[in-house]
Amino acid sequence: MGALRFIREKLKPLLATKFAGHSCMVVGDPAGVQRAQTDERSVFDIFKAEGFKIVPAKTNTITARIAAVDNWLTRSIDGGAAHLVDPGCKALINAYRGGYRYKVKTSGEVEDKPEKNRHSHVMDAHEYACLHADPAGFGGGLFMQQGRREVRKSTFYY
């Protein structure tokens, strides 16, 4: 599925139904600014034309992205978790539960980059968001949530 179809068929309907009235900013892979040879538009151009504010992530290095996620996972705010994942984010939860992983070579060594699979795409996007929002890193804490909300413990069966 291309970017335009994804935006129109998936992203816009999701935002309209679940997040109506909220603003949205897209943080994308820095490679998304590269223009296609077919029509000279980039993925970023397509998002902008569809009305989105989009910025490239500060870096796409895996070490910085994983460090940003780790920073959120190991931080607490007012005694509670700083990093919350909505139970509806099943793809992200499944990535966290082992879908996002490093491939083991036949020699027993582990690859230096995560395996590219259906879980890696959602986790890559999540890493870019964490990197952008990381107050200790590149992002300056742009997504720090104000106020508190009720958090319920959930059990997941997949």
Question: Residues of each region from the PLM?
Answer:
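Mg2+-dependent endonuclease catalytic cores in nucleic-acid-processing enzymes, primarily RNase H-like
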Residues: 1-117, 136-137, 149, 155-158
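Acidic, Mg2+-coordinating catalytic module of metal-dependent nucleases/exonucleases
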Residues: 116-140
